[in-house]
Amino acid sequence: MNIMLLGAPGCGKGTQAEQLVNKLNFIQVSTGDLMRKEISLNTRLGLKCQEYMNAGKYVPDQIVNQIVSQFLKNTNDKLIFDGYPRTLEQAKSLEQMLDLYNKKIDYVFYIDVNDQILIKRITNRLVCPLCKASFNLETRKPKQEGLCDFDNTKLVKRSDDSLDKVQIRLQTYKEQTLPLIDYFKTNSKFIEIKADDLSAEQVFNQIKGELKI
């Protein structure tokens, strides 16, 4: 069983992916992690990724898709796709790759949250620079103010979590990623979760209930 999580920045996709990995033993497909691994191994694809990143450019779909394809070839099912695909073209390429390895997306969960709530969540977010754990001054406060619950490292605010940058990210999401919702509505088991007033645990319980596991 493979699932996809869709939703705007700040909707809680990362938190749900973390829960699915920790509680239900799913494997998260992170294109960022996959690219960093290729770079650390100095592979041909890794060197290409590094070239684009050093220039401050997005790594082209063609390269990202090759890296994802390698991963899919050597991985069993029970995958979570979170943050990939971002565009319609990536989605179509992913379905072709999955088909090649006799895999498919079984469930697509769209976590829908109001823009004003998203902005408030993101601008209140703090992250641990060491373990990458995410906290929120509104919804997920650290046990000790300003410090990570897991390693006591001082929490920081991500540079792209400022109000102006959040607004740009939401606009980019609407232009590039919203079309995916219409696409997957007709291609997979599509489940929309209205999460404005739901806690992360309530969202997780809805997902778990749909998966029947």
UniProtKB/Swiss-Prot annotation:
Enzyme class: transferase
Region of interest: NMP: 30-59
Enzyme Commission numbers on file: 2.7.4.3
Subcellular localization: Cytoplasm
Ligand binding (ATP): 10-15, 125, 134-135, 197
Pathway: Purine metabolism; AMP biosynthesis via salvage pathway; AMP from ADP: step 1/1
Entry similarity comment: Belongs to the adenylate kinase family.
Annotated domain remarks: Consists of three domains, a large central CORE domain and two small peripheral domains, NMPbind and LID, which undergo movements during catalysis. The LID domain closes over the site of phosphoryl transfer upon ATP binding. Assembling and dissambling the active center during each catalytic cycle provides an effective means to prevent ATP hydrolysis. Some bacteria have evolved a zinc-coordinating structure that stabilizes the LID domain.
Protein name (Swiss-Prot/TrEMBL): Adenylate kinase
Organism of provenance: Mycoplasma mycoides subsp. mycoides SC (strain CCUG 32753 / NCTC 10114 / PG1)
Gene transcribed to yield this protein: adk
